[in-house]
């Protein structure tokens, strides 16, 4: 009996350790990025999380870089895991989703090939800024995107939002949810139903711990589309003076520190179609004008000949 009492403290200690271990395991998640695999294998049992697809250790106290997030999304598609599976229309730009190459800091490399023989150069946001070429294409640097314009169109409301209230709410959102320094949100414009949010950040302005405007814009875009990257959150719930802000369309424009290098091949099918329609219309107009003039000229000649014939047939006095 005494021996059983001696073992009781040891059993309680083992039970406490097991409970602590299970609790640590259950709390080992990344609140700012659910596309991670977390464990307590860090030094001293510390929770550490690695991005899916790249296995890069991420800092869960801030936003994960856009390059690592795109890498994780492509990994989720390939593995069939239903984490953040966007619709086929939920693309970042006209080129759609691709499997990016990231450097050791999680930033986009200057040249991207999507694991194919076709390559192109991208900016710091990962958006193509040159024509596509082969693997001999050289991209000397990653040109920084210093200005991002987010354009939103909200659903019809009983009355327009107050501009000042809307401005304050969006600034609070970017500061509290995306940890973006207030100085990097330069302006909020509003003309019902269009809202424009301007983010500006030069390389010299960004500190070591500052969130990049590219990452903040990407997290915001996923939130707006109901595909939140935050752990345990379902989309975005923004209210202005108690009135919910429901967004039905999002467009994001990127301005780089250097102009893009596109050739005339960059013309889209839509632009080419417009040019073709205008050209056909001009040619048709010219043809109609020429035919009309010829018809009028022919009538005049017939009248002149008829009058001349009548004059000849009249008897002389």
From Swiss-Prot:
Disulfide bonds join 67-102, 113-119, 121-139. SUPFAM superfamilies: Thyroglobulin type-1 domain. Expressed in kidney, lung, ovary and testis. High levels of expression in immortalized keratinocytes. It is a single-pass type I membrane protein. Residues 25-270 are extracellular. Glycans are attached at residues 27, 114, 162, 202. Its main location: membrane. Keywords: Disulfide bond, Glycoprotein, Membrane, Signal, Transmembrane, Transmembrane helix. One of its GO terms (cellular component) is membrane. Residues 292-317 are cytoplasmic. It comes from the Eukaryota. Residues 1-24 form the signal peptide. Gene3D superfamilies: Thyroglobulin type-1. It is found in: Membrane. The chain crosses the membrane at residues 271-291. May function as a growth factor receptor. This is Tumor-associated calcium signal transducer 2.
């Amino acid at each position: 009996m005494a021996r059983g009492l001696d073992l009781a403290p040891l059993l309680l200690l083992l039970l406490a350790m097991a409970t602590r271990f299970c609790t640590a395991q259950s709390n080992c998640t990344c609140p700012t990025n659910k596309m991670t695999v977390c464990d307590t294998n860090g030094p001293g049992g510390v929770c550490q999380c690695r991005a899916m697809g790249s296995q890069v250790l991420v800092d869960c106290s801030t936003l994960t870089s856009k390059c690592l997030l795109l890498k994780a999304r492509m990994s989720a598609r390939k593995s069939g895991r239903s984490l953040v599976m966007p619709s086929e229309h939920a693309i970042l730009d006209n080129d759609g989703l691709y499997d990016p190459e990231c450097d050791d800091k999680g930033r986009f490399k200057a040249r991207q090939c999507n694991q194919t023989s076709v390559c192109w150069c991208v900016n710091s946001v990962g958006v193509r800024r040159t024509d596509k070429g082969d693997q001999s294409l050289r991209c000397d640097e990653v040109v920084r995107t210093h200005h991002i314009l987010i354009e939103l169109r909200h659903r019809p409301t009983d009355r327009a939002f107050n501009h000042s209230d809307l401005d304050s709410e969006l600034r609070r959102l970017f500061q509290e949810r995306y940890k973006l320094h207030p100085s990097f949100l330069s302006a909020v414009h509003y003309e019902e139903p269009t809202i424009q949010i301007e983010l500006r950040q030069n390389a010299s302005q960004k500190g070591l711990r500052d969130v990049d405007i590219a990452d903040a814009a990407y997290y915001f875009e996923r939130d707006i589309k109901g595909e939140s990257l935050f752990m345990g959150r379902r989309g975005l719930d923004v209210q202005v003076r108690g009135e919910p802000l429901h967004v039905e369309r999002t467009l994001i424009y990127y301005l780089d520190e250097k102009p893009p290098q596109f050739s005339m091949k960059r013309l889209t099918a839509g632009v080419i179609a417009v040019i073709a329609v205008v050209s056909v219309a001009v040619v048709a107009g010219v043809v109609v004008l020429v035919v009309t003039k010829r018809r009028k000229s022919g009538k005049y000649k017939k009248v002149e000949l008829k009058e001349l014939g009548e004059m000849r047939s009249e008897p002389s006095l």
